[in-house]
């Protein structure tokens, strides 16, 4: 691993960047303007930028969120969300689903042939986050998950992140619930980072922008070792691990 203080010499080796959003572009409260300017500069160098986020919501919702936070649209070419690639997983499970997450995330199911049912009627579980009427800690779900596990219901996790920092606060994410369900012996299915589907989708979108691109010409940027870095290594990409500020980075050499 090599510590970097400037992105220019490194980025010249690549044709494109897959960049994380939460923790790199913003922290849920404030935008990291230095990161936005760096991404704009990367595009000005003739490179393509695809934002990869474990948000459980569709791309269109993330675009609106970034606009509301006044993130310059010139800092990216395309966006791929965990929510979008998770929809394919949802189509692979039985129709009757028990949804765990805030009401705003139900947009994840729009247009799909799902029937939302109560816990006792469900044939599968879709999780985007924590319920609004339960304490937002994983332990509060153990009893429910033991009941669901006894029925061998598959658990689809739309946001694999375990925890995120929202300003000065730490917030548990759906990945923490998926981890608990798996620890109880349940079957968990995930399409977001660090798993292949989100990278495969991003690569297809990148090739629509640039034509044929070699993986060794794509750099992944993120602040999550277990999501961004692990996913990049699995997919065969070089990665930059963000530590604090955008320009203080460590390069993680590609592992084949």
Could you describe each region identified by the protein language model?
Residues 1-21, 26-47, 52-80, 84-256:
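Asp-based, Mg2+/Mn2+-dependent phosphohydrolase catalytic module
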């Amino acid at each position: 691993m090599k510590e970097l203080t400037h992105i220019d010499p490194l980025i010249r080796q690549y044709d494109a960047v897959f960049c994380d959003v939460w923790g790199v572009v913003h922290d849920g409260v404030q935008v990291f303007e230095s990161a936005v300017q760096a991404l704009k500069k990367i595009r000005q160098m003739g490179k393509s930028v695809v934002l990869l986020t474990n948000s459980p919501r569709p791309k269109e919702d993330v675009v609106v969120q970034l606009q509301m936070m006044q993130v310059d649209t010139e800092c990216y070419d395309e966006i791929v969300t965990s929510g979008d690639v998770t929809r394919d997983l949802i189509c692979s499970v039985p129709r009757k689903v028990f949804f765990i997450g805030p009401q705003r995330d139900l947009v994840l199911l729009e247009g799909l042939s799902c029937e939302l049912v109560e816990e006792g009627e469900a044939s599968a579980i879709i999780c985007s986050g924590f319920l609004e009427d339960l304490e937002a800690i994983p332990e509060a779900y153990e009893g429910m998950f033991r009941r669901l596990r006894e029925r061998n219901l598959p658990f689809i996790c739309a946001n694999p992140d375990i925890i995120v920092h929202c300003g000065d606060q730490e917030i548990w994410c759906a990945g923490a619930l998926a981890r608990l369900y798996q620890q109880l012996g349940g079957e968990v299915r995930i399409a977001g980072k660090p798993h292949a589907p989100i990278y495969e989708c991003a690569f297809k979108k990148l090739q629509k922008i640039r034509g044929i691109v070699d993986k060794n010409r794509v750099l992944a940027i993120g602040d999550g070792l277990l999501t961004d870095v692990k996913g990049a290594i699995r997919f065969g990409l070089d990665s930059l691990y963000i530590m604090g500020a955008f320009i203080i980075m460590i390069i993680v050499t590609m592992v084949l």
